[in-house]
Amino acid sequence: MSCYSPCQTAACGPAPLANSCNEPCVLRCADSSVAIQPPPVVVTLPGPILSSFPQSTAVGSTASAAVGSSLSAGSVPIGAGGSLGLGGFGWSGLGRGLCGTLGRGNLLC
């Protein structure tokens, strides 16, 4: 039986910080012939069709995970809900300025 794989195993796009690719792959193998006796009869059986769903995942980082490090993708900052990844410390913003609560609900910008 002869089979070949027409499916590509290369990455499915550019190498971003995190990427996941899941594309189906179908492999068709050659037909088989069988001789059944007696009396001699030739029957052609269809070849198997093999299906798979390969997955490739790439995860990376461009900055340290320390608090205060700026992580960005294409000059757009990304973090944990706030600018510079300080969303859990009462700071908010879109990376263009820092605003946060100071003391009894006073807003510091």
Curated annotation (Swiss-Prot):
- What name does this protein carry? Beta-keratin-related protein
Quote the Pfam families the UniProt record gives. Answer: Keratin
Keywords in alphabetical order, please: Acetylation, Keratin
Q: Which gene encodes it?
A: BKJ
Which GO molecular function annotations are given, in alphabetical order? structural constituent of cytoskeleton
To which protein family does this belong?
Answer: Belongs to the avian keratin family.
Check the record and name the InterPro entries matching this protein: Keratin
Which residues are modified to N-acetylserine? 2
One cellular-component annotation, GO: intermediate filament
Q: Does the keyword Repeat apply?
A: no
